[in-house]
C-alpha cells in the first residue's frame, strides 16, 4: 500500500487560506485532510459542508474527508463527493462499519478506516477487503495540536 501525504487543513492559517492552498499545490501533496467533527462522536465542532464546497471550488487536490461524526453513513449526502475523494470513517462511530464503508463506495469515493490509538488493529479484520486504506491516528480524535501518542 502506497503511503500518501495529506496535510490537515484544520491547522492552516484561515486568514491566508488561498496562499496555503497554493503552497499545497506547489508541493504536489497527494490530498488535503479535512476534519469534520459533530460535537457528538468527538467533543469538538469543526469544518463543515460549506468549507468542503469552498475547498473543492478552489483546488483540484483530492480531499481526504475525515468524518469524526456519529453514523457517518447517514451524512455522506451532505457533501459534494467526487471519485478523487477519500472518506475516512471510525469503527466506533457506527454500529455497522460495513454499511458505512459500502455507503462511501456507493458514492464513488475511496473508503478509509480511521484507527484510533486505543483501537486494536483486529477491529479492521472484517473490512480489510472493502477499504482502500487506513488512517492511522497518532492522537485521540477531536482536537488539533495534541502531543503524539
Locations of regions flagged by a protein language model:
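Active-site mouth loops of central-metabolism enzymes
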Residues: 3-16, 43, 62-70, 90, ...
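Conserved anion-binding
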Residues: 13-16, 58, 74-75, 82-149
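Glycine-rich, proline-tolerant flexible connector loops at the mouths of alpha/beta enzymes
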Residues: 32-49, 139-147
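Conserved, mostly hydrophobic/aromatic
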Residues: 17, 24, 32-35, 79, ...
Amino acid at each position: 500500500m502506497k503511503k500518501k501525504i495529506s496535510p490537515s487543513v484544520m491547522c492552516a492559517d484561515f486568514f491566508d487560506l488561498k496562499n496555503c492552498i497554493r503552497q499545497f499545490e506547489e508541493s504536489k501533496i497527494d490530498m488535503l485532510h479535512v476534519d469534520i467533527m459533530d460535537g457528538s462522536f468527538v467533543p469538538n465542532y469543526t469544518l463543515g459542508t460549506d468549507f468542503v464546497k469552498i475547498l473543492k471550488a478552489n483546488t483540484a487536490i483530492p480531499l481526504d474527508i475525515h468524518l469524526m461524526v456519529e453514523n457517518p453513513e447517514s451524512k455522506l449526502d451532505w457533501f459534494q463527493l467526487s471519485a478523487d475523494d477519500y472518506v475516512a470513517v471510525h469503527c466506533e462511530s457506527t454500529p455497522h462499519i460495513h454499511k458505512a464503508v459500502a455507503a462511501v463506495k456507493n458514492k464513488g469515493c475511496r473508503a478509509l478506516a480511521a484507527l484510533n490509538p486505543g483501537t486494536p488493529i483486529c477491529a479492521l479484520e472484517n473490512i480489510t477487503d472493502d477499504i482502500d486504506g487506513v488512517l492511522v491516528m497518532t492522537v485521540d480524535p477531536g482536537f488539533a495540536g495534541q502531543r503524539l501518542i
